[in-house]
Amino acid sequence: MESERSCLLSSHDAGKGGSSSVSSASFNFINSIIGSGIIGLPYSMSQAGLPMGLLLLILVAFITDYSIILLVRGGNLSGTHSYQSLVRSTFGQIGYIIVSVLQFLYPFIAMISYNIIAGDTLTKVFMRIPGVGPGNILTERHFVIAMSTVLFTLPLSLYRDIAKLGKVSLLSMILTFGILMTVVVRAATLGPQIPASDDAWVFARWNAIQAVAVMSFALICHHNSFMIYGSLQEPTLSRWSLVTHISVGSSVLVSAVFAAAGYATFTVYTQGDIFENYCRSDNLATFGRFCYGVSIITTFPLECFVTREVISNALFKGGELSKSSHVIITLVIISATTAISLSYDCLGIVLELNGILSAVPLMFIFPSACFLKLSNERWCRGENLIASMILVAGVFVMIIGLIMMALFPQDCSHGAEMFYCSASNTSSTASPSNILQFINTTQNTSIV
């Protein structure tokens, strides 16, 4: 394996690099990982049980880290520089078509979810502005989505060099800490006021496989791995491993704290979009919504870069797009995602479906399968054993996840105020006695 490593390192040492430093590439990678999926992680804890959910999150993070490096190693072994070309070199045209469809669908659906979040989140922020009532145009999700597209996501998506998004990604990371602070503070102040059910703290639940799908959606970044790898000033395996470890490690730390704090606050009442749990009159939650809405807008262009690259590889054989082709393809992608997000607003189902159909194959199955086929060792020996286990786990999660999704579909409670919000009309949360009194009254009424 030492000789193989030397070959891998030398294969790109002489290759043409980009303009990104390790820190800039890490910012872009972390921004790609911590996208819309993080908002559903508290709900995944509700599906799996908090202890089991955290264990599964760490396991999925390990698989993410390991398979990202496998992906680039496979690319170096085969002499390819994109996910699609790697799969074509190992599994032929059929494999190329399948992975192209998946690699297109994942970021495309992710962009739809980003628009849904921006529309749902920022409208609630604008409602808190004095003088902005329910009939105001700023409270219309269609208007907010359209304006955020025209003013922000479209101009940023028109960049040709992903390295130019480094500063925007840094801004997104700063905003992410604002979101994290909101959830953690409310776990301490609001959590004790919402009584948990008897099974709120069980070790594990049967819906754990569905939780893995949501976690996979939250942590996947394989679809733009080659793009960020190629943007490094010196694209070597050692530098790429450092970027991967920093990015995945930082992301899973933020994700674990976010998931645990969010679930601890609302337990069995946790929604697919955690911000749907907070009352509209909560000023701190409004700050968190603002941070998340802006963060999502800055993440959108990264996914557009990937979608555009997939189209370029499929239609133009990977050649560099002309300026006019670049603009036209970008406009088509943005228009399509915007049109769909304007007509559909149920986020939870979008996250879970994208996790099972796109994220799991791209994260678990294809990186392991490509590396195993390119490796000369047996599947049951050395590091190939880990790749084999990841491959089997991916197939299992995908099949069982689809079955569980059909048997236990998510409810879409978009825009509904939670019952405990009626107990207080102030921007700060109500006293515990008021909340508990309201909940007990509601429960007694339902029993009668």
UniProtKB/Swiss-Prot annotation:
Pfam families attached to this UniProt entry: Aa_trans
Spans traversing the lipid bilayer: 22-42, 52-72, 94-114, 143-163, 165-185, 200-220, 246-266, 286-306, 324-344, 346-366, 389-409
Any single GO molecular-function term of the entry would be: L-amino acid transmembrane transporter activity
Sorted alphabetically, which keywords does the UniProt record give? Amino-acid transport, Glycoprotein, Ion transport, Membrane, Sodium, Sodium transport, Transmembrane, Transmembrane helix, Transport
Q: Does Zinc-finger count among this protein's keywords?
A: no
Which cellular compartments is it found in?
A: Membrane
Top-level taxon of the source organism: Eukaryota
Sum up the protein's function in the record's words. Putative sodium-dependent amino acid/proton antiporter.
What family does this belong to? Belongs to the amino acid/polyamine transporter 2 family.
- In Swiss-Prot or TrEMBL terms, this protein is called Putative sodium-coupled neutral amino acid transporter 11
The species this protein was found in:
Danio rerio
Q: Which gene encodes it?
A: slc38a11
